[in-house]
Structures are given as structure tokens and as C-alpha cells.
């Protein structure tokens, strides 16, 4: 038997209670069950560096919708949650926290610093878990992981050793992003590029043996000390005769060659560029092609070094810039200085300008490892949704460079490389060896560096299932099915997971990558601290409930596209939850303790058949859209059905048989049975999107069932397909809308009933419409809905409404009181006459037109136009009424 709902829906009163019930009953938990097909996804682990933002809310809502959907379809659905140690991000946060306490990180020491960082992790990982629970995510908390937990650390060490032994990992010198403040290498993902105002300094480079010179424009004159060549385009006729000659390097006693390289854009600037291989990634590649020396002019803190700095040694890079520009000008090398805006890379954590430098680091050779990941897209083992991201993925993989995996920080997986204290031999393995294989020494020092965060994250789909051990979980749940993530980390994470999956398990880690966009503010701007436009999802949940936030994030959402966040949409989503609640409450109040039976003679009940048929089609459409990852489209179909067809139409149509059950108990039973069945199916379809409100309603509607989230997903059934009844009710809706429009246009109150005549030659349609006559009386304020084949007996002055396959007539005398309406319209005519005169007076006043703001003048013109249109309608209506009166 159904139970009644509270009068109003209060999210705060039910969300925590329901989530606790779900967890206590282990509804989110999955174990190996060979009788079921698994569906697995892993949560992109949020960093432990703070609170969740709106992007996390979107990402996890999408995942939760999919996992709830698959669970209801009968899959053994596993969603693995976890957090990322976020190496450098966390280290910066903890370092700053220590600074506020007056503690220096280096004085504290590595071990004590790591203790503090683990404390940070415990605090913030718990905060993130609590926030995710408030969102309603149904991940398996019994399997929660951390990228530095024992199992993940074991996998990381195993992979490093394996790749090293196979020759893929090596230590070498290459150009990398370097942070002079944090004193560590950085990935491209950790570098933010922003447009900054700067200058082009045009400098003379004298050509040796001539009186001529090359004019070079640079935004970084301080790197001149590291120049080892001037490059020009091979096809540039201006410079063909000087390729191979030497230039004098200003401010030094060195000479550098002029080389030809296709890297140069001959249309940009002077067509000649300085090459500084140790301080620019593009120059580094040019240098490799031409065997140029690599001169590093900077120390780790971005001061100029002693070896190549000369008089500028010890200066900060910007201090050196000023000094060098002054010397260039004094010595006649500076041609001109031109303002120029250009992109500058800064560390996303400490906001220091990043310095490209050649450093000895640990790298992964990528060319061979990338090949299976490329082939996966081409042979269909892996796909992106939307498909357009296939090209982006392939472009990055086909142009991939060796991957720098070492970081000069303490928080992270320490590199398992050990150096012999006697001879320097490098040994990579599980712990330090007993003795050096080269010299026999028994003393070793472990490499100080840690691994890049993404190195461990790349193993996430299989390390979380027990790899490198061949566990039952790994055998059953891996490969996973879908990865949900943003397009901004395809290169930094997705690609690395794919090649890691092939390298270590022989399989792609997932078969589908479902890409979503960014959540932007209402103006389309990226949410950021600097703009102050971030929106805290927890504040939205606190005010409107989790379901309202989830629905807002899905409204209009399309795979791969950015979305704008509007507070108005949150209110609309909350209103929808209230609408569903109130409709459900009405239904349950009328169900009471009635024993309902599946109705017989359904063909005699077009309204019941129509809504069952519409609901059946909805099940099919939603399922198809869910399977195509068109989650936003699926939600819009559910919304339209529940708000419009079910609440606004069917419930209103069902009221007559419910309220007149004594006259026709069979019709009342049919209406109530249909209401309950359609509500049950609708709640199931809506549940993945709005789990809390649907679960609460369902638990009261069918208290004998265990839980909505554990119920079966609805399926399309041919027996509930009623195209004839759909056609009848579609016509009925047009008739009701037409009558309502006429009543509104003529200002007829609902208290004034009328008779509507429907002239319809189609017998089947007419018969069906006749069965809906009682419903029409309430929905269109009618005395009666009369169906006939011709116009006989209908007054000549009746208002006609043309609808498909029929015409509706409303006798005018039943709609209005002529005297009363003429009096009302006469008063309206007088009012409009005054308004038109007032408006004309203002617009004919030259002072108003010339001195008032343009917007104010235009506003008055718009008012006048509206008044004139209204006056024309009033006059036309008055003339018509007076003519009928006479």
C-alpha cells in the first residue's frame, strides 16, 4: 500500500537520511559475480588540495547517472572512487601553511615534511569524500583508493622498474619547464599561458668579415648570452648568400654561425631568429638538427650563472635584462624597442614565470609505447564521445615527445633508483641492493626525485583493481567500460592511461572515453579565483538540494561542449522537483488503500492508453539516448513528458473519473492504476538524474520494494503502443488549447461555462473525442463537449477554432455578457486614448527628445506603438460587439 508524502519537498530533511540508507545497505558495493555482466568505471581522482568545484560536480554527476542507469539495467556496476596526491600542488600548499607558522620546509627536513603532508591528506581527502556524498554519488566507498596508498605505490614501483629494464625509462638531459621558485621541473599541464604586454628588442648581430649585420628581434634579450646560432629560412632569398657565415654575438667575444632551418617563419619580423637551445624548446630542436652547443646561462633560481654570465653573473634574470639592454644601447647594438603582446608561461601554483632549461631528468621513451594507443582508435578498440576528439587524441600521440617523469620535490612516489656511494653505479629495483654489482660497495643513496603525478594516475584503471597482482577483481572488472573526463586532460591523463594499459596489461583500460566540457559562468567566462566568479556547488546544494544542482548541470548538456551556469536554471530545477513531488502527492492521496487491478477494456479509455503509450515511447527514447551518451537530451525528454504530458495533461484528465468513482468505479480504477504505473516508470527514468527526490517518492509509492535504485530499468513493450489513442488525445489537446486561447483573448472567466461543438467527419476520431468529454468540461470550463459531423444547430455568430481534422465552435452568447463587455472595452478605449495623448505629447516635445537618454526616448516610442496596437484591437472588438447587438 502507498504512503502519503509530506506536504512540501524538503531536500535537507531527506538527502542525508537516504544516502546513509544506501550506504548501510551496500547498494553501491560490487563484488565479483560471474552470473552478471560487469560495468566498471573509475572516478578521475580529485586532487587533495582543496574543495570540489563545479567542474568536479559535473564530472561526477555524469558518472553517477551512467552507473545508476547500468545498475538498474542489471549490470554488476562498479564505480571506484579515490583521490590524487597532486604532488607539486599539495607540496606548495603545505609549504605555504608551514610559512604561515614560521617554519622553513628545508629546516624541517624531508621526513617531518612528509608527516605534515600526510596529515593534510587525511584532512582534505575526508572533506572531498563528504562533498561527493552530498552530491549523491553512488560509488563503492569500500573500494576508495589514493594514488599513494600501498597498492598504488606497489604498482608505480613495478611499472618504473619494468619500463627501466625494458629500456623505456632513461635519465638524460633535455629541455624542460623549470620553476625557479619551487625549483622543480614542470609539465605543460602545470604551466598557465597568459597574454602579457612586453617588448621586441631589435638587436644588431654583426656579420663577421663584413660591415653588414643581421637585425634580430627578441622578447628575451637576457638569453642572448646563451645564443649559439642565427637561423634563417632555407628559401629566403635575402639570406641565401650568408648561410654558413658567422655573426659576432653582442656583449661577448663569441662568434656564432648562421644556419638555414625550416622552423623559421620568413614572413615574421626580419625573418632571422636567434637560437638559444638551452632556453627555448623550439631552439632546442633546431640545435639538435644542427649540432649546436647548448649553453645554460642560468642557475636554478633564474639568476645568471658564473660560467657564462660575465659581468651579469649573480643578477636575477630581469635585473640582467635591464643591464644588458642598457649595454646594448651604449655599445650601438640596440636598433629599436617595439611594444609587443605575447604569451608568457607561469607556474599554475606559485605564479612564477617558468624558465625553459636543459636539465638532467628521468624520461620515458614514448615512440614505441604510443603505437598501440594509436592503433586502438584506428581499429575501434577505443572510441571517444563525441567522435571529433579522436583527431585530437591522435594528433597528440602522433607528435608525442619523450615524457619527463621526475620532479624535484618531496611529496610523491620516490624514484626507485639507487646510486652506489663508491662508484656511482645506478641500480633500479625494489629497495637498495645488498652490494653494488660493479664495485661491490654496500652503501647506496636513493635518488632524491619523485615521480610526476600523472605517472601514478596513468595506472589508475588497473592499479585500483589489484595490479600487478592477478586478482579476481582485475580479471572480472578490467578492462573498465567508460571513462568520463574533461577535454582539457585528454593529453595529460587519457593518453597516458591508454598506453599504460597496453604496456602493462595488454589491453586498452576502457573502450569508451566520454568527454564533457567546462562549466563556465553565465557570461561564458571560465570560473577562476582571479575573476571571483566561481560558484561553490556545496552552497547550491545547501540552498536548493543536490537534485536541483544535478539537473541544472544536465540541462542542455551536450557531450564535449562547454556549458554556462545560470542560477535561474537551479531555481527551475528545484521547481521541477517540487512539481514531481506535488503530482506524486496528489496521486498517493487518491490511491489511499485502494486495491488496484490492471484495467480491462483499455481501448475504451483513450486518455489512459495515450499516457501509457507516450510513457512507453519515452522509455525507448531515453534508453536510446542514454546508450548514445546524450544524457542532456534524455533528461529533456523526461522533463517534457513529466511536466507537460503527465502533470499538466494526464493528471487533469484523470481527475474526472477519480472524483466520480461512484458513478464509474471501473474508470476510476483504470485512471488510478495508470497514474501509479506511469509514475513508477517516470521515477525510474528520472532516478539517475535526481536520485533523492525520486527515491523518497518511490519508497512511499511502493514501500514493499527494497529501493528504487535497485529496481529494474523500464523496457519498451509493444503491448503499450497505442498510436490511435495518441492521435485522439493529440487532437483533444489542440481543441482544449484552442478553447483556452479564445477564452483568454475574450477575457472570459472560468466561472462562465460554455458549450463547445466539435465538427469532425472522422468517425474514429469523433468517437474517441466523445470519450474525453467529461475531462474537457473541467479543463476548458465547458458545460459540454458536443461531437457532431456537421454544423447543424450551431449559431452563425459562434466563434470558430480550426484544429487538424476538425473545427470547434463556441456560441458567442454563452461566452460573454454583451453589455458588460462593451462597458469594459469603452473604459479601456478611454484609458488608451489618454496614454496615446500623453506619449505623443512627450515625443513631440523637442526638449525631451534631445535631452533625455536615447534608451528612455526609445522606451516611450515602444510604449506608443503598443498602445496604438491595443487601441486598434479594442476598436475592432467594440465594433464587432455593437454590430452583433444591433
State what each model feature region is.
Residues 202, 395-455, 459, 503-546, ...:
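Feature 926 captures the class I aminoacyl-tRNA synthetase adenylation module centered on the KMSKS loop
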Residues 3, 17, 21-25, 95-214, ...:
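Residue patterns forming the tRNA-binding/recognition surfaces of aminoacyl-tRNA synthetases
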Residues 31-94, 147, 156, 216-219, ...:
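N-terminal catalytic cores of NTP/NDP-binding nucleotidyl/phosphoryl-transfer enzymes
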Residues 68-76, 97-110, 130, 134-139, ...:
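Secondary-structure transition/capping motifs at alpha-helix termini
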Residues 253-259, 448-478, 644, 648-651:
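Active-site-adjacent "gating/activation" loops or surface patches in catalytic cores
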Residues 56-58, 281-286, 496-505, 638:
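Alpha-helical support elements that line or immediately flank enzyme active sites
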Residues 1-54, 77, 335, 348, ...:
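Non-catalytic terminal extensions that flank enzyme cores
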Residues 34-36, 44-45, 78-91, 144-152, ...:
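Short, solvent-exposed turn/loop segments enriched in Gly/Ser/Thr/Pro and often Arg
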Amino acid at each position: 500500500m502507498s504512503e502519503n508524502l509530506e506536504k512540501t519537498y524538503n531536500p535537507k530533511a531527506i538527502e542525508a537520511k537516504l544516502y546513509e540508507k544506501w550506504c548501510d545497505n551496500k547498494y553501491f558495493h560490487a563484488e565479483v559475480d560471474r552470473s552478471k555482466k560487469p560495468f566498471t568505471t573509475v572516478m578521475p581522482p580529485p586532487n587533495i588540495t582543496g574543495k570540489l568545484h563545479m567542474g568536479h560536480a559535473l564530472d561526477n554527476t555524469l558518472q553517477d547517472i551512467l552507473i545508476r542507469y547500468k545498475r538498474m539495467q542489471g549490470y554488476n556496476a562498479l564505480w571506484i572512487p579515490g583521490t590524487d596526491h597532486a604532488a607539486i600542488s599539495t607540496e606548495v600548499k603545505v609549504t605555504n601553511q608551514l610559512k604561515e607558522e614560521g617554519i622553513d620546509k628545508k629546516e624541517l627536513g624531508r621526513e617531518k615534511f612528509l608527516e605534515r603532508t600526510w596529515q593534510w591528506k587525511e584532512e582534505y581527502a575526508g572533506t572531498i569524500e563528504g562533498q561527493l556524498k552530498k552530491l549523491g554519488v553512488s560509488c563503492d566507498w569500500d573500494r576508495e583508493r589514493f594514488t599513494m596508498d600501498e597498492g598504488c605505490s606497489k604498482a608505480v614501483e613495478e611499472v618504473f622498474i619494468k619500463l627501466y629494464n625494458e629500456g623505456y625509462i632513461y635519465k638524460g638531459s633535455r629541455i624542460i619547464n623549470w620553476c625557479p621558485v619551487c625549483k622543480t621541473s614542470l609539465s605543460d599541464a602545470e604551466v598557465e599561458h597568459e597574454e602579457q604586454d612586453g617588448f621586441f628588442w631589435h638587436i644588431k648581430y654583426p656579420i663577421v668579415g663584413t660591415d653588414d649585420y643581421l637585425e634580430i628581434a627578441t622578447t628575451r634579450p637576457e638569453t642572448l648570452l646563451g645564443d649559439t646560432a642565427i637561423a634563417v629560412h632555407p628559401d629566403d632569398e635575402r639570406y641565401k648568400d650568408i648561410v654558413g657565415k658567422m655573426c659576432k654575438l653582442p656583449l661577448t667575444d663569441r662568434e656564432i654561425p648562421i644556419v638555414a632551418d625550416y622552423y623559421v617563419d620568413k614572413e615574421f619580423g626580419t625573418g632571422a631568429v636567434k637560437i638559444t637551445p638551452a632556453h627555448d624548446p623550439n631552439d632546442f630542436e633546431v640545435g639538435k638538427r644542427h649540432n649546436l652547443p647548448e649553453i645554460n646561462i642560468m642557475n636554478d633560481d633564474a639568476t645568471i650563472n658564473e660560467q657564462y654570465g660575465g659581468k651579469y653573473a649573480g643578477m636575477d634574470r630581469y635585473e640582467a635584462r635591464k643591464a644588458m639592454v642598457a649595454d646594448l644601447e651604449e655599445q650601438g647594438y640596440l636598433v629599436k624597442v617595439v611594444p609587443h603582446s605575447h604569451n608568457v608561461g607561469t607556474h599554475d601554483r606559485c605564479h612564477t614565470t617558468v624558465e625553459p632549461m636543459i636539465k638532467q631528468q628521468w624520461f620515458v621513451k614514448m615512440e614505441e609505447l604510443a603505437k598501440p594507443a594509436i592503433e586502438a582508435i584506428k581499429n575501434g578498440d577505443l572510441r571517444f564521445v563525441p567522435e571529433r576528439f579522436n583527431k585530437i587524441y591522435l594528433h597528440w600521440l602522433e607528435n608525442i615527445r619523450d615524457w619527463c617523469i621526475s620532479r624535484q620535490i618531496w611529496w610523491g612516489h620516490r624514484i626507485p633508483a639507487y646510486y652506489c656511494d663508491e662508484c656511482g653505479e645506478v641500480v633500479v629495483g625494489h629497495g637498495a641492493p645488498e652490494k653494488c654489482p660493479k664495485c661491490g660497495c654496500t652503501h647506496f643513496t636513493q635518488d632524491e626525485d619523485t615521480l610526476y603525478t600523472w605517472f601514478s594516475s596513468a595506472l589508475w584503471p588497473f592499479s585500483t583493481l589489484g595490479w600487478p597482482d592477478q586478482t579476481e577483481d582485475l580479471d572480472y572488472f578490467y578492462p573498465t567500460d567508460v571513462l568520463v573526463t574533461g577535454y582539457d586532460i585528454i593529453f595529460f591523463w587519457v593518453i597516458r592511461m591508454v598506453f599504460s594499459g597496453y604496456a602493462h596489461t595488454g589491453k586498452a583500460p576502457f573502450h569508451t572515453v566520454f568527454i564533457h566540457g567546462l562549466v563556465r559562468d553565465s557570461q561564458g567566462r571560465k570560473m577562476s579565483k582571479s575573476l571571483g566568479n566561481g560558484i561553490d556547488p556545496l552552497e547550491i546544494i545547501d540552498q536548493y538540494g543536490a537534485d536541483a544542482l544535478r539537473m541544472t548541470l544536465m540541462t542542455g548538456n551536450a557531450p564535449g561542449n562547454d556549458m554556462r551556469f545560470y542560477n535561474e536554471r537551479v531555481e527551475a530545477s528545484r521547481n521541477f522537483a517540487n512539481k514531481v513531488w506535488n503530482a506524486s502527492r496528489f496521486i498517493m492521496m487518491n490511491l489511499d488503500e485502494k486495491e488496484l487491478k490492471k484495467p480491462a477494456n483499455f481501448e475504451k479509455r483513450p486518455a489512459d492508453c495515450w499516457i501509457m503509450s507516450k510513457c512507453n515511447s519515452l522509455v525507448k527514447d531515453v534508453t536510446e539516448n542514454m546508450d548514445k551518451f546524450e544524457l542532456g537530451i534524455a533528461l529533456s525528454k523526461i522533463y517534457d513528458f513529466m511536466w507537460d504530458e503527465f502533470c499538466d495533461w494526464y493528471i487533469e484528465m484523470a481527475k474526472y473519473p477519480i472524483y466520480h468513482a461512484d458513478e464509474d468505479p471501473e474508470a476510476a480504477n483504470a485512471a488510478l492504476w495508470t497514474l501509479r504505473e506511469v509514475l513508477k516508470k517516470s521515477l525510474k527514468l528520472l532516478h539517475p538524474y535526481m536520485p533523492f527526490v525520486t527515491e523518497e517518492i518511490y519508497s512511499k509509492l511502493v514501500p514493499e520494494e527494497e529501493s528504487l535504485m535497485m529496481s529494474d530499468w523500464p523496457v519498451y513493450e509493444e503491448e503499450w503502443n497505442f498510436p490511435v489513442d495518441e492521435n485522439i488525445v493529440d487532437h483533444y489537446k489542440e481543441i482544449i488549447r484552442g478553447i483556452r486561447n479564445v477564452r483568454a483573448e475574450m477575457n472570459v472567466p472560468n466561472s462562465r461555462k460554455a458549450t463547445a461543438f466539435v465538427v469532425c467527419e472522422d468517425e474514429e476520431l469523433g468517437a474517441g473525442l466523445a470519450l474525453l468529454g467529461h475531462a474537457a468540461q473541467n479543463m476548458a470550463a465547458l458545460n459540454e463537449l458536443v461531437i457532431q459531423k456537421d454544423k447543424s444547430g450551431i449559431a452563425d455568430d459562434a466563434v470558430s477554432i480550426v484544429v487538424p481534422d476538425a473545427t470547434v465552435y463556441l456560441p458567442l452568447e454563452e461566452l460573454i455578457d454583451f453589455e458588460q463587455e462593451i462597458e469594459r472595452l469603452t473604459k479601456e478605449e478611454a484609458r488608451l486614448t489618454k496614454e496615446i495623448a500623453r506619449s505623443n505629447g512627450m515625443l513631440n516635445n523637442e526638449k525631451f527628445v534631445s535631452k533625455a537618454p536615447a534608451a528612455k526616448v526609445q522606451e516611450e516610442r515602444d510604449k506608443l506603438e503598443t498602445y496604438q496596437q491595443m487601441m486598434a484591437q479594442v476598436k475592432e472588438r467594440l465594433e464587432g460587439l455593437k454590430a452583433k447587438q444591433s
